[in-house]
A protein has these predicted regions:
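Bacterial N-terminal signal peptides that target proteins for export
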Residues: 1-6
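Hydrophobic h-region of N-terminal signal peptides that target proteins for export
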Residues: 11-19
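Flexible "cap/lid" subdomain of the alpha/beta-hydrolase fold that forms the substrate-access gate
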Residues: 20-30, 39-41, 51, 86-120, ...
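Conserved HGGG/HGGXW glycine-rich cap/lid loop of the alpha/beta-hydrolase fold
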Residues: 45-88
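Short hydrophobic "strand-cap" motifs at the C-terminus of beta-strands
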Residues: 55, 81, 252-254, 278-281
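A short, glycine- and basic residue-enriched loop/turn
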Residues: 61-62, 127, 282
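Catalytic histidine-centered segment of alpha/beta-hydrolase-like enzymes
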Residues: 281-289, 294
Length: 305
């Protein structure tokens, strides 16, 4: 009931997000609202050629990929969804485990009549990406995975004990009340503490995403992404029990964040992993070091399988 009552407010809040300017997607892109199993994803689609799916994480939306999409659109069919409950996608009650969200990605591709895809992911997008790749192994040709771990895999149990990731367990009705109306303050913590240079995340970017996360149910559903980590860990171990991924993977770590540990973790689930560490960057690679990050991605995509 509450979600139905808030639907009009969602439309109003979306206009707040539009008021803050970030790098736009080029005119070659159109948007579609694509129905999946229990959700409707806001998807940007542009270009022609082999498919590339770009998946974002917490603290941003598919908008983070606009600079890369502008480069790839000339050679690829570029598909950029907002994950369920995030950005301009719908806010279903459940389905925030990454196994279910991998199904969202599959349904998007099915709707577009696309079978195979390259995959580029960051943060929580990595977790959805692994769940997709592990369940639909014959649909992924290559994966670029950026600066975040996979629940239940590798050094996960040590990572979740770090005070840096206290937010993994920060959720619940009272926690949501603490953040409500203070979304910008909450998000500033991530941009400031997880970056090598907080000034690289400019005011327009911060205002844009703060407005998106101030939309009704947005923080609630973002917290649900973290709440699903325990189930994600169970699912990931089950995926791994069926064998490692064998297609090529580029694991990108920021030198002030995961660094070489990014590739180390991915090697637990894959056999063909190349490592790239981006200098002078924290977790927010596309904002802090976009040129170096995009150059690394473009270089690996240019390689023939």
């Amino acid at each position: 009931m509450m979600r139905r009552l808030l639907s009009a407010a969602v439309m109003l809040a979306a206009s707040w997000a539009a008021a803050a300017s970030v790098v736009p997607f080029p005119p070659e892109f159109k948007t579609q609202e694509i129905h999946t199993d229990g959700a409707t994803l806001h998807v940007r689609i542009g270009g022609h050629g082999p498919a590339v799916v770009l998946l974002h994480g917490f603290g941003d939306s598919g908008d983070m990929w606009a600079p890369l999409a502008a480069q790839l659109v000339h050679d690829y069919t570029v598909i950029v969804p907002d994950l369920r409950g995030m950005g301009l996608s719908s806010h279903p009650e459940g389905g925030y485990d990454k196994k279910a969200q991998a199904g969202d990605v599959a349904r998007v591709l099915d709707s577009l009549q696309i079978r195979d895809t390259e995959l580029i992911t960051h943060d929580i997008g990595n977790m959805v990406g692994y769940a997709f790749a592990a369940q639909y192994r014959d649909r992924v040709t290559r994966w670029v995975v950026m600066d975040a771990p996979l629940p239940g895999i590798g050094d996960w149990e040590h990572i979740i004990c770090s005070p840096v990731v206290w937010h993994f367990n920060f959720r619940g009705p009272d926690e949501e009340r603490l953040v409500a109306g203070r979304e910008r303050i909450y998000l500033d913590r991530f941009w400031d503490e997880l970056s090598a240079n907080p000034q690289a995340i400019d005011e327009a970017t911060r205002a844009h995403y703060a407005a998106l996360y101030a939309r009704p149910l947005a923080i609630h559903d973002a917290f649900n992404q973290f709440a699903a980590f325990s189930q994600d860990a169970i699912d990931n171990k089950a995926f791994l029990a069926k064998g490692k991924l064998t297609f090529p993977i580029l694991a990108i770590g920021a030198d002030k964040s995961f660094g070489t540990a990014m590739a180390d973790d991915i090697r637990f689930v894959a056999t063909d992993v190349t490592e790239l560490v981006i200098a002078n960057s924290g977790h927010w690679l596309m904002e802090e070091q976009p040129a170096a990050t995009m150059a690394g991605i473009r270089a690996v995509l240019a390689k023939k399988h």
